[in-house]
Amino acid sequence: MQVTVNERDAVQSVATAHPAANGESHGHGMDKLVIEGGHRLSGEIVVSGAKNAALPILCAGLLTGDPVDLDNVPNLKDVRTTLKVLNQMGVKSETDGCRVQLDASRVDNLVAPYELVKTMRASILVLGPLLARFGEAKVSLPGGCAIGARPVDQHIKGLQAMGAEISIEHGFIEARAKRLKGARIVTDMITVTGTENLLMAATLADGETVIENAAREPEVSDLAHLLVAMGAKIDGIGTDRLVIQGVERLHGARHSVIPDRIEAGTFLCAVAAAGGDVRLTGVRPHILDAVIDKLREAGVSIEEGDSWLRVKMDRRPSAVTIRTSEYPAFPTDMQAQFMALNTVATGTAQVVETIFENRFMHVQELNRLGANITIDGNTALVTGVDKLSGANVMATDLRASASLVIAGLRAEGETLVDRIYHLDRGYDRMEAKLTAVGANVRRLSGSQA
């Protein structure tokens, strides 16, 4: 049966209707960050594991009854939510710092409920593994950041090609299949979570699956490397054509999550904006090529080693034009941070967003700080100004909140960033890491604010 979902309607009603309710459910209530601008940054920052690799990797624990031992897992809201979803299904998990051990030998509930899924779209990633190992799954339609339409349809079409019967009723995706069959799947758009879901499902399918137009993101490759360690047979890792020979069962494995290239890029932009000399450790520079190239174009000095980067900046940046696209091009998740950098640059630059609609919500907030940005469709025109001045601003989504922190580090006076529960979804204690290199940033908890 064919299913089409207008996912935007399902998503927007959740994401925009209750920003406050969303915030209260995030543990910290309505925390704020207070930033006093004008401090240079110097010292060392350790980059955490990648959120966008950790989430699918945690879900891959569902594919085996053996223990899966993970390291370098970031301590983030979205990770904790994913673990809650898994725990509700009967997965046992033990967390010790950055280590997480999963045991999915006694899964007894194949439903991912709305209360958990609505705060995080990545919960859709349990669909493929549950269907492949248990033959059925029921997953609530997702929520998460309020950024335009997301392509759940691609997941559904791919699983249907592998023989799954899927219906959408009462806000749930319900799927069943005796055993998935290998298939050739061509997605009509590149989708990271879609590639991950289909890749996990294919590992236990009967026969060969070919995923054409697969996402090439390093986080997809990291998931693939874990699956191979668990006994999966996958060719073409890192390319847009993944070939999977299904196996009867997967076994346990140990795996260390790759470093977060977006967190690393965010700190590079922070130093570029505030000025200073900072060493980032625990990084993989080669997966940051597009970002590093653009920073060098802006006049930033960057040295790279195997697992470190040193970033130095002692002048005003030059404006750089960026255009977001799929990996290995410039990442949409770094667009807002570069917009913040361009606000204080010399010259004028275009920022073109080709991946998500509705991803310029930070523009009016940056303009409140004195930036000069105009929007025309999917393009923002940024004319650099001599100085920004601190003001009260509000975070609207994860990367927008990072851009406001970067702008605040550069602005004169005090900037107050409200609703930073968005920031906590993707950054592990950002204010602590910035404070350690000389920034003046402090968190006000909901009660003080």
Swiss-Prot record:
Top-tier EC class: transferase
Gene Ontology, cellular component aspect: cytoplasm
Signal peptide coordinates: none
GO biological process: one example: cell wall organization
Annotated phosphoenolpyruvate binding sites: 51-52
Alphabetized CDD domains for the sequence: UdpNAET
Reactions the enzyme catalyzes: phosphoenolpyruvate + UDP-N-acetyl-alpha-D-glucosamine = UDP-N-acetyl-3-O-(1-carboxyvinyl)-alpha-D-glucosamine + phosphate
Role played: Cell wall formation. Adds enolpyruvyl to UDP-N-acetylglucosamine.
Record-stated family: Belongs to the EPSP synthase family. MurA subfamily.
Protein name: UDP-N-acetylglucosamine 1-carboxyvinyltransferase
Naturally occurring in which organism (per UniProt): Burkholderia lata (strain ATCC 17760 / DSM 23089 / LMG 22485 / NCIMB 9086 / R18194 / 383)
